[in-house]
Amino acid sequence: MRRYHKMEKIGEGTYGVVYKAQNNHGEICALKKIRVEEEDEGIPSTAIREISLLKELHHPNIVWLRDVIHSEKCLTLVFEYLDQDLKKLLDACDGGLEPTTAKSFLYQILRGISYCHDHRILHRDLKPQNLLINREGVLKLADFGLARAFAIPVRSYTHEVVTLWYRAPDVLMGSKKYSTAVDIWSVGCIFAEMINGVPLFPGISEQDQLKRIFKILGTPSVDSWPQVVNLPAYNPDFSYYEKQSWSSIVPKLNESGIDLISRMLQLDPVQRISAKEALKHDYFKDLHRPPEFLNGVH
């Protein structure tokens, strides 16, 4: 760790403390120190293998993992540094983002996700806090792959409850078949939040989270979601709710935006649109794409 000089603590994430630091060449970076439970026997070798794979991810919309440093009791991930995240931006923008900004951010989120999904890596814990933004308006996804390496704890490093607001209904009901669709659900929730300025499903417990989802999307049935009855937490006596119209939920979205969000926020994961398909959606046809969007990875 002598190569890095800690400048300040910048956050406490799901897995540990994050510091702003400087390396010997004067470059600013972010150090994410992964805490290992005291009773654990050091860092699992599987985690180190998983994390090492993430160093191979190179994409303009993925936060670059520059280095991995591990000692017996601590794993430090060295990332490129970005000074803003989507949560801070949304907190500062009353009433949601400008439509063109929301569209640009959504496109970039989907590009990053599509790239990771192509590499068979899921995020599983997407939320505005781990979508980082630089001053040029480039958005990058942070913490990809960490859920598989370390499992998402119920409580974070600081003992805060890890948010359920962006978690898919299939996961909330105990599905262990994680697929790319879990990330698409999270993106749909973030899309609505960028437009409305407030979280779409701000639940306080798993039950409350499901109730909020069903109040908007309607209570699932075997007809609308055939596999729902096989989920561990499925309850045939869930309160019955009618599906609401998307135009009343996201009134500022145009017709193509409503079509896209409705394809993302499908209760049945099999019916959710893929990131690759979403990138081709009509909603983006008028998006001004900077050259790096068109050239792909650089």
UniProtKB/Swiss-Prot annotation:
Its EC number is 2.7.11.22, 2.7.11.23. Residues 4-284 form the Protein kinase domain. SUPFAM superfamilies: Protein kinase-like (PK-like). It catalyses: L-seryl-[protein] + ATP = O-phospho-L-seryl-[protein] + ADP + H(+); L-threonyl-[protein] + ATP = O-phospho-L-threonyl-[protein] + ADP + H(+); [DNA-directed RNA polymerase] + ATP = phospho-[DNA-directed RNA polymerase] + ADP + H(+). Phosphorylation at Thr-14 or Tyr-15 inactivates the enzyme, while phosphorylation at Thr-158 activates it. One of its GO terms (biological process) is cell division. The modification Phosphotyrosine is found at Y15. ATP binds at I10, G11, E12, G13, T14, Y15, G16, V17, V18, K32. It is found in: Cytoplasm. Coiled coil: none annotated. It comes from the Eukaryota. Keywords: ATP-binding, Cell cycle, Cell division, Cytoplasm, Kinase, Magnesium, Metal-binding, Mitosis, Nucleotide-binding, Phosphoprotein, Serine/threonine-protein kinase, Transferase. The modification Phosphothreonine is found at T14, T158. One of its GO terms (cellular component) is nucleus. The active site is at D125. InterPro entries: CDK, Kinase-like_dom_sf, Prot_kinase_dom, Protein_kinase_ATP_BS, Ser/Thr_kinase_AS. Its cofactor is Mg(2+). Belongs to the protein kinase superfamily. CMGC Ser/Thr protein kinase family. CDC2/CDKX subfamily. Serine/threonine-protein kinase. Involved in the control of the cell cycle. Required for entry into S-phase and mitosis. Probable component of the kinase complex that phosphorylates the repetitive C-terminus of RNA polymerase II. May form a complex composed of at least the catalytic subunit CRK2 and a cyclin. This is Cyclin-dependent kinase 2 homolog. It comes from Theileria parva.
